[in-house]
Curated annotation (Swiss-Prot):
This is Acetylglutamate kinase. It holds the Pfam family AA_kinase. One of its GO terms (cellular component) is cytoplasm. The record marks 32, 251 as: Transition state stabilizer. It comes from Bifidobacterium longum (strain NCC 2705). The keyword Transferase applies. One of its GO terms (biological process) is arginine biosynthetic process via ornithine. Substrate binds at residues 67-68, 89, 190. Signal peptide: none annotated. It is found in: Cytoplasm. Pathway: Amino-acid biosynthesis; L-arginine biosynthesis; N(2)-acetyl-L-ornithine from L-glutamate: step 2/4.
């Protein structure tokens, strides 16, 4: 890879990462893979390289992914009409077959292949495997009343044993966001990948949850680009949730869920930037928006970092 940095500047970059390498050695990092990083070939490659780098320097990355654009493309190719209610896709049994096929048979396989080009590290699985996730069917309130949107659910419980076994074996789990229905294990639900990643991060005792998106982070006054929030306490974020726009709200709700579940830090970062995960984890400035427990935020502020 070509770079204009001098040798001494390259050394400075590596040295800047040293305290973070020491802090995060042996820690689990759950990464929600989504947005443009899933559809741009160069960004896909960068993401895979980031996961390999994390593993090789002693961290334990765990990936959770959705696949909205790929699902929409396949439904269109198969002539299956997508209906939306209140901005949410209605998932019929026919559409659910496509969701399952695309997530576990296409998106997962592609990412596993990109990672494993660097060595036999990644293992694909879904929320169905090993009883990882259990979900409850969602009935969102639209126009003031509960609405049936089909086979869509929320993760309500996690058995992370299968993921723990893979991590202990030095593997990188790549988890597709589908899960059996808690009320009928033969029925599979499409679950929100942000929320699933948050639930898994809490279950495995992750040090960080990192969510990739297509904006720089959370803005206090969107679309004012100067209002980007670098750090925020979980209670302030909780107060903001009702007023957030529909695309950002589930991501910030996932951050709140992770912090409430004991994860020390949750981040929303711009996945359109190559190697954004490494920039967040291994640089002093970081990028995007970091969510922390209020007491953790106060402690960082008192120490000036």
């Amino acid at each position: 890879m070509h770079t204009d940095l001098r040798a001494d500047q390259k050394a400075e970059v590596l040295i800047e990462a040293l305290p973070w390498l020491e802090e995060f050695a042996g820690q689990r990092i759950v990464v929600k893979y989504g947005g443009n990083a899933m559809v741009d070939d160069h960004l896909k490659q960068c993401f895979a390289e980031d996961m390999v780098f994390l593993r090789q320097v002693g961290l334990h990355p765990i990936v959770v992914h959705g696949g909205g654009p790929q699902i929409s493309h396949m439904l269109k190719a198969l002539g299956i009409k997508s209906e939306f209610k209140g901005g949410l896709r209605v998932t019929t049994p026919e559409a659910m077959d496509v969701v399952r096929m695309v997530l576990t048979g296409k998106v997962s396989r592609e990412l596993v292949g990109l990672i494993n080009a660097h060595g036999p590290l990644a293992v694909g699985m879904s929320g169905e495997d090993g009883g990882l996730f259990s979900a409850m069917q969602r009935r969102p309130v639209i126009d003031g009343k509960p609405t049936d949107i089909g086979l869509v659910g929320d993760v309500v419980s996690v058995d992370a044993s299968a993921v723990e076994d893979l991590v202990a074996a030095g593997r990188i789990p790549v988890v597709s966001s589908v899960a059996p229905n808690e009320e009928d294990a033969t029925e599979v639900l499409n679950v929100n990948a942000d929320s699933a990643a948050a639930a898994l991060a809490a279950a495995v005792g992750a040090h960080k949850l990192v969510i990739l998106t297509d904006v720089d982070g959370l803005y206090a006054d969107w679309p004012d680009k100067n209002s980007l929030i670098g750090r925020i306490g979980v209670e302030n974020l909780r107060d903001m949730l009702p007023d957030l726009e529909s695309g950002m709200r589930p991501k910030m709700e996932a951050c709140v869920r992770a912090i409430d579940g004991g994860v020390p830090q949750a981040h929303v970062i711009d996945g359109r930037k190559p190697h954004s995960i490494l920039n967040e984890i291994f640089t002093s400035a970081g990028i995007g928006t970091m969510v922390m427990p209020d007491e953790g935020l106060e402690m960082r502020s008192s120490y000036g970092y």
